[in-house]
């Protein structure tokens, strides 16, 4: 009987402790949100950017909320509906100012904790709507949809590793999340993400051609170079072939069917060839670039010639 009583007391105490921790976290979140409402300041660089949410003193409310970590997300989500004003202002050197709302800081906290970008619904003027302005369909239409997105993401990912989440982000609808994933997998030399990056390049090589897709495949190639597996060389060559072809389309003589003069991004071209070089094929990469120089240099405008020459000179030191 004494043992049973002690057991019940222990279980009751543990339940109280767990419940108390949950209540304490929710209360702490509310306290820091109250502090956000008192935040002041102006855009530091005059581009209309959000006034510094992470000052050197990490006792600031945004920094404190980030420290609370992933378990805080369900308590933060309701505050996305808080559109009350802080005392901080976005300022642009062109003259306009805009007072910052509480939920603009809340979304920053959520993005920093999750290492994944969510976005507040885009605000459109009546004139923009009437003119048929296009809004990215991947963005939420309203706060409720945003809250659902974040809650769904949290339930799926709260216990997963950053590696697993970044591998998922390679196929995310938001291109900022895809680029962030490419960069992270390369920077951490994540061999587990290699095949995912290679498959992503295969997808990008299909269908319509645009500069976003070309920048993505170059970013994937760059990360594969950092991961360093020679098995990636074949897919990287495909990226080099694709970018080389479209450079030719941009700079070949008009009578040969030039299209989109100047649309080719030289930085992506050299980025992909640099990846081929670091995988052990430097001579091949340089040879490819020198062929391009001999064929199209004379068709480039002066600034493009200078950019190409500068990049080719650097390439010889890869």
Per-region residue spans from a language model:
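Extended repeat-based scaffolds of very large eukaryotic assembly and lipid-transport proteins
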Residues: 17-318
């Amino acid at each position: 009987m004494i043992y049973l009583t002690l057991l019940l007391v222990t279980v009751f105490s543990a339940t109280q402790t767990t419940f108390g921790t949950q209540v304490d976290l929710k209360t702490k979140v509310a306290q820091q949100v109250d502090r956000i409402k008192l935040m002041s300041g102006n855009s530091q660089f005059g581009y209309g950017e959000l006034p510094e949410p992470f000052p050197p003193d990490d006792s600031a409310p945004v920094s404190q909320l980030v420290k609370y970590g992933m378990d805080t997300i369900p308590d933060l989500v309701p505050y996305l509906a808080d559109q009350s004003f802080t005392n901080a202002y976005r300022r642009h050197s062109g003259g306009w100012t805009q007072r910052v709302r509480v939920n603009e800081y809340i979304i920053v906290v959520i993005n920093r904790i999750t290492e994944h970008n969510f976005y507040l619904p885009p605000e459109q003027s009546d004139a923009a709507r009437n003119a048929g302005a296009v809004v990215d369909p991947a963005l939420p239409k309203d706060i409720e949809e945003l809250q659902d997105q974040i809650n769904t993401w949290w339930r799926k990912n709260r216990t997963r590793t950053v590696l697993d989440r970044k591998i998922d982000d390679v196929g995310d609808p938001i291109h900022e999340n895809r680029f962030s994933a490419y960069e992270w997998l390369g920077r951490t030399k994540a061999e587990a993400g290699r095949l995912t990056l290679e498959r992503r390049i295969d997808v990008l090589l299909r269908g319509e051609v645009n500069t976003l897709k070309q920048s993505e495949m170059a970013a994937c190639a760059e990360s594969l170079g950092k991961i360093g597996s020679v098995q990636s060389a074949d897919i990287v060559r495909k990226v080099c072939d694709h970018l080389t072809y479209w450079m030719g389309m941009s700079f070949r003589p008009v009578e040969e069917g030039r299209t989109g003069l100047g649309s080719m991004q030289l930085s992506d071209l050299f980025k992909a060839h640099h990846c081929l070089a670091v995988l052990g094929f430097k001579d091949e990469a340089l040879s490819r670039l020198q062929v391009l120089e001999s064929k199209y240099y004379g068709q480039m405008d002066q600034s493009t010639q200078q950019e190409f020459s500068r990049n080719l000179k650097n390439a010889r030191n890869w």
